[in-house]
Amino acid sequence: MSQDHESLENLLNEDRQFPPTAEFAAQANATAALYELAEKDRLAFWDLQAKALSWETPWTQTLQWEAPYAQWFVGGKINASFNALDRHVIEGRGDRVAFHFEGEPGDTRTITYAQLLVEVKKTANALIELGIQAKDRVAIYMPMIPEAAIAMLACARIGAAHSVVFGGFSADALLSRIQDADAKLVITADGGFRKGGAFALKPAVDEALKGQHNVKNVLVVQRTKQETAWNSATDIWWHEIVDRQSAEHTAQGFDSEHPLFILYTSGTTAKPKGIFHTTGGYLTQAAYTHRIVFDIKPETDVYWCTADVGWITGHSYIVYGPLMNGATQVMYEGTPDTPHKGRIFELIEKYGVTILYTAPTLIRTWMKWGDEFPNKFNLSSLRLLGSVGEPINPEAWMWYREVIGGNRCPIVDTWWQTETGGIMISPLPGVTATKPGSAVTAIPGISAVVVDDNANPVAKGHGGFLILDKPWPGMLRGVWGEDERYKETYWSRFKGIYFAGDGAKLDKDGAIWLLGRVDDVMNVSGHRISTTEVESALVSHESVAEAAVVGAQDAMTGQGIVAFVILRGGIAHASGEKLVTELRNHVAKEIGAIAKPRQILVVAELPKTRSGKIMRRLLKDVAENRQVGDATTLADPNVMKLISEGLNTSKDED
């Protein structure tokens, strides 16, 4: 890219702004003073946040930093499980509900902090009986049931690092993660309930364990009571070993830098990256961010994060952050459309949910289904909404605010990653004015900068690369067993500065707008255009519910823009060519003629991973007439076949 060229075009303008109400600001956990406090002395600020937790041994040094290696709260000793559970019970909060669990078939469990603590202690004792020690690794492959959180907390209690593998992953994916972490134990279930029926999990574990590994036992929760193949030499039913354990177990403190968990993210190469987090810094950031970003009032709020514990969002904002803050949560096993498309809204009404944290992909799905589903239920208990996982289009943001939030709930659009451990960029409710589609600003204590090719900060109104130029407590400590890969992946683009591949722009007010992965930037006739901006322009059209955009090779322009769109419910696909022309012109009007898609294909579904992220590389394969690459992590592998057939019959525009 030439030096005088913009790192990333800033094309889409968004002027709507929503300042906090006086009423919300008056009761908010966050204040504007937090920014000043953190700015004045960053390390003293993080010291203060760490002191909100219970430490067995205080630390002697806040930060030891030799890029790219950080140690936080050096010399301190802490137990994650004690902070999530014991201290609440000791301080008289044992009767507070920790989880309202709702199974997909409609079975429910209400679990208090005292009850959760007993279950975690018994499970910790069972792990010890199975020979698991501090520093061992345990793989967890579970449905969204309370035992998933119990297993994680029991591992943390005895100092064994957990590696949670999302229950939708294949046997091969599970085996590669078991091997990489050298897990000694796998905790799983016979299966779970999804889309109206039982699915099996144990067979994938059995299949995975045909490979090379050092797993000694498989601990199995009986969730569905389906017939399950059994190896009596290694397999143990959870209820048979856990139920008979003592409910006494004293949690010991582990070094602040003791590994807490490994979580695998897909790499560009075949081998997934084992992102590992340690204890003291991660817990500090998870608890602090959950408290200020979600304005949590543990005595009165009912909080619901719709993520799966198999993802970092489930680790930080279901298991660790909320429990450390003594929150009451909803945990739901099933899918948003079972037994009907209003299921999430029905549960918000049933449990009086006050804070909802979900993903743009689900918000756009709700838009596609139509307003009648949320409108059937009373959502007046909601007081704050959150978004996580990818940039949210302004139109989806506005719909979320108006239809779900009744125009009264602040929206926290949060940017962070598996690697960062906790939220890094987000409005603070009660303090920050929000803008549809913008994550606005780094939270107090975090330094995030948008820079050009030479690591110089860009001016307002310009785009570039998002970097984190100062260490933070929740940061990854490396890629498990692959030190060179850690340095190469995150620290090589800008020397000694963390860059994880996201593009961003600053608007005229200096607010940060995330533009997705820089790999998702298209180069059209020398203009670098973000897929996110073109997608947002398409979704702002009244007919479009969801859009995915890729750059495909083009003899004339270098790359041509190819768009795949899902129409809103009730709009006939027959509108065909007329609608396609209208959409191309709409993008030109919103962004400029340079961003006009070369081709637009109306599709029924988009290829998404099981966590809801759109797999643009597969769409790029189709757009460039290549054989479609590895689609094993797709939620629905048939989607690509249908899209390929559709694109071959659609014509290029002028």
Task: Describe every region a protein language model picked out.
Residues 95-97, 218-220, 231-264, 271, ...:
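Conserved pre-ATP/AMP-binding loop-to-beta segment of ANL
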Residues 120-121, 243, 275-296:
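Conserved structural elements of the adenylate-forming
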Residues 153, 157-240, 352, 359-360:
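Structural core segment of the AMP-binding/adenylate-forming
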Residues 165-191, 205, 349, 356, ...:
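AMP-binding/adenylate-forming catalytic core of the ANL superfamily
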Residues 239, 320, 324-327, 354-358, ...:
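Gly/Ser/Thr-rich phosphate-binding loop
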Residues 283-302, 312-355, 368-370:
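Conserved AMP-binding/adenylation subdomain of ANL enzymes
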Residues 441-445, 456-490, 529, 627-628:
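Conserved ATP/PPi-binding loop(s) of AMP-dependent carboxylate-activating enzymes
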